[in-house]
Amino acid sequence: MSTGRIIQITGPVVDVKFPSGQLPEINNALTVNQQGAADGAVDVKVTLEVALHLGNDTVRTVAMGSTDGLMRGTEVLDTGGPISVPVGEATLGRVFNVLGEEIDLQEPVAEGTRRDPIHREAPSFEELTTTTEILETGIKVVDLLAPYTKGGKIGLFGGAGVGKTVLIQELINNVALEHGGISVFAGVGERTREGNDLYHEMKDAGVITKTAMVFGQMNEPPGARMRVALTGLTMAEYFRDEQGADVLLFIDNIFRFTQAGSEVSALLGRMPSAVGYQPTLATEMGQLQERITSTKKGSVTSIQAIYVPADDYTDPAPATTFAHLDATTNLERKLTEQGIYPAVDPLASTSRALSPEIVGEEHYNVARGVQQTLQKYRELQDIIAILGMEELSEEDKLIVARARRIQFFLSQNFHVAEQFTGQPGSYVPVKETIQGFKDILAGKYDDLPEDAFRLVGRIEEVVEKAKQMA
């Protein structure tokens, strides 16, 4: 292993000079272990990742930890390979940082646990599966109107406090309980408090044993935030490739991955492109997203929370992410105000899988019927607000009545929210979801009160609730 010396430190970017002919490769991990001097200087231990070869036997690196206290002339060791992180069963129920070090104050991962490099090629064309398979979530509004596919990429849009985290927890819970699946959660540049809350809530809900968690939060240097998504993805890939599992990968928030790249880019000496983003934006995003896919062995399905800066969907960061998405789940604050949870907007959420070839004619027709009814109701709301319900034709009154029932029936109780609501959660199979909405559209339940449809699972529960209300 070759040894170099630090010649320049610019914030999170460090230049290192190596002896002639001993340059480390791009993406190699270098370690610095600076012993504190006698005058009270602290020990500094930091990992660097090679980003550029500058010539003159010098490399430019990005630090994965704080460079405070680092001095020029300090010795740097080339590890001979990329950052590698623990994978496999040992990671479940644990919390790691970008380097695969445990940060949950529990026992260290067992010696001899397999470690995989975080940089690797995406699966080749031959390895990819050619069939599109639907991932049943048990959440009615998702399964009916914007179904997720195995190995797909789903964008989760929503402001603060509309239920992104609860929806993520419920998906982790349902996949673990109904499909025996494994989840990996990557916290990228978000609040440490939220990560801490999520960990404890998942512990209480009993789903932590099926989940590995990786965090590089807001307070971390940009290098860590830029690479932590790859650490989580590497852990997920092991379960897909070695165990043939269907894995859920949650990334919260994918925008911070781009943001961290842009923070480092200028310091690396690259010319900024549009809106000050890095010129390599599309490449970096592609390298991450192309590894998230279904192979013949298993699948990695990713659900990515996406922050949209200033609600500008044309901003290069969200616009680049959109190109990779198969489905979007849009959370709407207006629905939370009406007490409809999950607050998924049934008209704004989309999925490529919602086509007769993939979901079948019946599912497609029911979903489109539901959307038509809700769209008509939305158009009639202005008239109702000005003139009142009495001015509507009989046909329109019927549409409004059914639309309200549909809107309420799209809500349901979640297992992970049982401790707040006191109501048992419900998992609704797709077939029952389709049948329920088909019957509502056909007018089978026009005589039941609207409130009977609120926060229930199957359509039979509506009938039961209506009897109790009578």
UniProtKB/Swiss-Prot annotation:
Record's bilayer topology term: Peripheral membrane protein
Pfam families named in the record: ATP-synt_ab, ATP-synt_ab_N, ATP-synt_VA_C
Instruction: List, alphabetically, the PROSITE patterns matched.
Output: ATPASE_ALPHA_BETA (PS00152)
Q: Is the Nucleotide-binding keyword given for this protein?
A: yes
The UniProt catalytic activity note for this protein reads: ATP + H2O + 4 H(+)(in) = ADP + phosphate + 5 H(+)(out)
Subcellular location(s): the record lists: Cell membrane
Q: What HAMAP family does this protein's entry cite? A: ATP_synth_beta_bact (MF_01347)
Please give the name of this protein: ATP synthase subunit beta
This chain's source organism reads: Shouchella clausii (strain KSM-K16) (Alkalihalobacillus clausii)
Q: Which gene encodes it?
A: atpD
